[in-house]
Swiss-Prot record:
GO cellular component term, pick one: Mon1-Ccz1 complex
GO biological process: autophagy; protein targeting to vacuole; vesicle-mediated transport
Location in the cell: Endosome, Multivesicular body membrane; Prevacuolar compartment membrane; Vacuole membrane
Basic and acidic residues composition bias: residue spans: 29-49
Record family assignment: Belongs to the MON1/SAND family.
Gene encoding the protein: mon1
Region Disordered, residue ranges: 1-93, 126-145
InterPro entries the UniProt entry points to: FUZ/MON1/HPS1_longin_1, FUZ/MON1/HPS1_longin_2, FUZ/MON1/HPS1_longin_3, Mon1
Function, as annotated: In complex with CCZ1, is required for multiple vacuole delivery pathways including the cytoplasm to vacuole transport (Cvt), autophagy, pexophagy and endocytosis. The MON1-CCZ1 complex acts at the fusion of vesicles with the vacuole, through its regulation of the SNARE complex during the coordinated priming and docking stages of fusion, and particularly at the stage of tethering/docking.
Name listed for the protein in its UniProt record: Vacuolar fusion protein mon1
Key words of the record: Autophagy, Endosome, Membrane, Protein transport, Transport, Vacuole
Amino acid sequence: MNPNALEQPQVAPGDDGAGGNNYGTQENSAKEPSKTGSDDSSARLEERPPPLPPRPNTLSLLDEGFISPRSTRQSSSSSLQAKATTAVSIPDISLLQLNDGGKENHPTRGPFGSLRAKASLTQLTASKGSDAGDSASIRSTAPNTELGEAENVFSDFLAQESGDVQQDSSGLLQFPEFRTDDVEDDFTSEFEPIGELDDDGRNEELLLERWKSKRKHYLILSAAGKPIWTRHGDGGLISGYIGVILTIISFYEDANDRLTSFCAGDTKFVIVTKGPLYLVAISRLLESDTQLKLQLEALYMQILSTLTLPSLTHLFSVRPSTDLKRPLQGSETLLSTLADSFTKGSPSTFLSALECLKIRKSHRQAINNALLKTKVSSLLYGLVVAGGRLVSVVRPKKHSLHPGDLQLLFNMIFEAEGIKAGGGESWIPVCLPGFNSSGYLYMYVSFLDLRENSGTSASETTTEQSVAIILISPNKEGFFEMQEMRNSLVEQLEKNNSINIIKEAIDGGRPTTTDIVPGTVLHHFLYKSRANVQFTMSSYEPEFTSISRRRSIHAKHAHVKVHHCISQSASSFAWVTPIFELYCVASPNANRNALAQSASKVVQWVQREEERLFIIGGAVF
């Protein structure tokens, strides 16, 4: 038998077999006279690959009945997105792809073009909203999700072959494409001071080792090279590192470019330039550029809340080498507590939204009416806040408080011990950059002692139990007017029993996932209403009591519409629509269909309880 007959045809896609080095031509037929014409024709047919099925223009993740778990396996390097984005979601879903080395490459696009996620697991539709006016809001409903539909949520994500998944001795699934997470790491030492430098400098090496052992650093520097604030250590101790960072930044600026981020090993550096200031974040906590940039923006807003933008600009225009430490004296604690909240995992920063205390709509309306009834002429904003959760707000028509401004206020009020001590009254000048970065407002703060009958002193009251009345006025001399309004408001709240309602809501705590969905596989969830810029979440108990565990579940990396991944400690599911964002965490062995069904039920529960969970409109004057 001729050995050439065993060779396979090499036909390129779309080749008609008529040119080049084709086998089965007349020349080859002459060499093999034993083959008939029909055999030759059959061989040519075998040489052609079968036609591919038509490629769809779009691929819906949620189309019923379409299941192709490995359809997104292949991706060319040309499909990688090179353009950065700060959007919460992007039109084209970014899917996790694996390269030849088994490492993650993301974001990439699937082979079928744009992937479109519907607004719900079962075609979420928006129903009629509330009454027109300032109370208007987006309403939505999520019908029941059947098992088959829940399956389809994950149908186009990578699925490991059953033989690729191994189980360790603890029963956890081992997925080689996911790195071991750091949820068991000890975070207690992260917030401990590194110590003071001795007069003779003998302990400098020890302090530098402690400084380098921290997982996260924040630096605020002037363009002239002066250190203004550092989260760990001081400018003198780490002056060498500061000099290196400034040199790198200056190198790019000299080339008419602006450096925004770079990596060195597993450490990420993000730089935000604000006029004469450089704000630098250094992180080994697997955070994205966007996350770190938002954190630096919040620290900058904290500086503006103390100085205002015109004052900051004037200081550096008169003297570019100004040392900003003295004007910011007293704000170091606020900067540090704000920075630590980012490291611990702040849901408010993570979602750029506020959390509200869950109470009945009628009870919240009673508090709103009390605020309106006792309002004085110089009032700009009035808030009742319980443990950092908003209970009620009164505001001018067509004016809303920026979530970033409220985050600064809550950080100042609930973290600064001087304000909270004794449960007394405070009158504080403050700039709200989101409202007006050019001037000061004046904030009256009074803490209510709800624990007087339980024998707990005001100084022992935890942040979660603290209730504050915050009244903001543009009038510098408005203290006594605000004090009078506070007294009248407390009298009204006691008369309509709102004080006890707030106390009961605080004592009740956040609901657990099993309170909401009995028998659910979920351990924790975060739900953000994008229309109201507010969020709600389940209790941390009992799975997420430590700082490291909480930080791990509040670490968002990808900008996608539907995302499911599994690590050695947890299974997570993210679902982003124009109406809401939902982030869920379950055990690593959780069934993905059960996870999707539980997520849908959480959405239904939130929408049933919407007016209890969120402040829609608030009190308006």
